[in-house]
């Protein structure tokens, strides 16, 4: 791994020379590409520097422990060493995930669609819990979070929730969240304390960039309907036709948005979701053969594939694709998703190395 890091650090030095040349500003496209690469390489360098510093601290503490006679100091040193070992393991996993060769689509914004599945109202409540989890995770990463569409259930959960997340490395870390998420817990409505199993499905759709010239949607292929927005229970909450339903006739993809009071805003949001769904379908079709091998390695991202189980009574979360089990579900639900997302990226990297891709 150190050899690979050295290669990237050499590349960082080259990039810094290039972006310091005033002539680079005359080529905005090249400057933009180099700036993105520089940010990525700098993040990798910072992660590696933290590892080197912590390794030195560990070495010094171990040396001190070998000659320490005071029992209290021995205990303190041992505790510090154990804590730093855990931290070093986390940092190494983060570095491994950063060593995954950058994909041009890594920084694409994503649209996440969460839907209640098996379990009725309890599944809808878990959608709400996951919405909060991803919101907190996005905030911790400095990403922008936006509600695109939401359909509440009777107990204030969500039958469906669609959100947009934008920022650096969004797709890179969130792409493996697609699939079926199973929850095992005692529902609030359960009077006998029995554990119920429910499930929700999540789709992660990369949002086409403005530079994406391949995705062209002809206005003639769209059927746009407007109607009055309605709230829970079917009551009307708007007396104007602000809700929008867009149908893409060639593919049959249908998107409805009614959360905004403005028809124009609802149409804009619906179009964003529509484009992301069409792009996703095209990419799946185009890369079907190439992704067959990869899907066997890290999960297909198919919404029918069970990827993760959240067991609340055991405070356990298990990702079935890589056999990762953590006993800190409480922290995960508070947005501490890095141990899972970085492990998935790292796993993908090792699979790419193993298969020579």
Swiss-Prot record:
Residues 285-305 are annotated as: Disordered. It comes from the Bacteria. The modification N5-methylglutamine is found at residue 235. One of its GO terms (molecular function) is translation release factor activity, codon specific. Keywords: Cytoplasm, Methylation, Protein biosynthesis. GO terms for cellular component: cytoplasm. Its main location: cytoplasm. It holds the Pfam family PCRF. InterPro entries: PCRF (IPR005139), Pep_chain_release_fac_I (IPR000352), Pep_chain_release_fac_I_sf (IPR045853), Prokaryotic/Mito_RF (IPR050057), RF-1 (IPR004373). Methylated by PrmC. Methylation increases the termination efficiency of RF1. It is found in: Cytoplasm. Disulfide bonds: none annotated. PANTHER family: LD18447P (PTHR43804:SF7). Peptide chain release factor 1 directs the termination of translation in response to the peptide chain termination codons UAG and UAA. Belongs to the prokaryotic/mitochondrial release factor family. This is Peptide chain release factor 1. It comes from Chlamydia pneumoniae (Chlamydophila pneumoniae). The lineage of its organism: Bacteria, Pseudomonadati, Chlamydiota, Chlamydiia, Chlamydiales.
